[in-house]
Amino acid sequence: MPSPSGDPVVAAPQRLPAAGAAALLRISRLLTTRRITLHALLLAVCLWSVYAIDLATPGLRDRAGHIKGADFLHFYTAGDLVKNGRLQPLYNPPALAAYQQALVPQSTHTYFVASYGPQVYLPFSLLARLPYGWAALVWALLNCALYFGCCYALWRCCPRLQPYAGAVSLLALAFPGFFNLIAFGQTSGPALVLFTLAFLALRSRRNFLAGLAVGSLIYKPQLGLAAAVVFLLAAEWKIVAGALAAAAAQLSFAWGWFGSTVMKQYFHSLLRTSQALPFIEPKLYQMHCLRGFWLLLLPWRNIAGALYALTAVAVLAAAVLCWRSRASLRLRFAALLVASVLVAPHLIIYDLIILAPAFLFLGDWVLERTEAATVPGLRVFLYLGYALPLLEPLAKASHVQFSVLAFAVLFGWIRLATREGPSLGYRASPAAI
């Protein structure tokens, strides 16, 4: 991010060789407010105009022949099952596919596997009262409202970003995580809301409430894995207690509402996850986590799994150190979010929506700490982490997911930043929150 004048003002990094530090400094100086805003504008126009053209066809198939709403079709089908009290097909893939094709005849040759708890599908029983096209539109608009509402609430917590409302709005609109959330019709929007609520609660020193938000991620547990480990190892007992209470309440509600039979079917389906991976993860180049990185890079699944475990443990250990540091809450929370993306065992591009707070907090931090040695690295890899998820075709061809490399290096720069001492704002240490 640039200085308020639009030109970067930074110190050369002291932990890199001279050539590397100079290169980072030169690149970071190119990232002025004007350039970043222009790039965001061009990206937003390209993404959303192409998407609009793709959808501008009669019927429920887009120009590429895919069902409009993409994954929303699965939630719509499951919601209709819940609405009609017909839950037996939910965790039976052949029966679910047959019901889906009867419900939406144009969805032939599109298949899904139910991998969520039944409580996730309950709200979709309301949308299932609408025709499929209208229901998909309502869900997209709801995701837009959740996303921009969270961005606005978090932007209000970033004083150095206040003069850049236009640039921030364009960056939010063009964010690849948001674009793919809408394009896929997925359910990662509520996860962003929960992380936002957790941050706001921590900022107000209400740890138990923060834990309630984190524990509610049990509906999409892979996104809460890093938070669970970090808060447990950092001995944040109020947060842990809140998380356990929220997770238990959500599962208890599901058990009470849907009954033992459905819950047993759900847990049995979780045990069969390895058999369903070809359906859940058909395109490894769409995954933006360490596990996806190693599986895409290496043809040997056992070795890839071992390397994922090793690198995930390293990231989690560093995340705990970040959280226990005396750095600002926004910097530590950004580290937690990037770690959450890296260590998640299953993370598709639309799940990157949870990084929106991290981009805001880190952008605000580099504007505040313009003389910090880590600013050039943070600025450059913030830019790369924002843009590289769009290069999935390159990942498919090269078998290297460059976004994960960018996230890993960005996480390393955040770790270095947490060791530079507390910043001017949000000085509270973990013990004080």
Language-model features: locations:
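Generic structural signal for short, solvent-exposed loop/turn connectors between secondary structure elements
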Residues: 220, 301, 325-329, 391-399
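Hydrophobic alpha-helical transmembrane segments of integral membrane proteins
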Residues: 172-173, 217, 224, 354, ...
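Primarily membrane-embedded glycan-assembly and transfer machineries that use lipid-linked glycans
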Residues: 2-209, 231-356, 360-368, 423-433
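Aromatic-enriched
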Residues: 363-433
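Transmembrane beta-strand segments that form the barrel wall of outer-membrane beta-barrel proteins
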Residues: 210-216
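Membrane-embedded alpha-helical segments of transport systems
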Residues: 219-222, 248-253, 377-378
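Long, hydrophobic, well-ordered secondary-structure blocks that form the structural core
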Residues: 147, 217-219, 223, 227-229
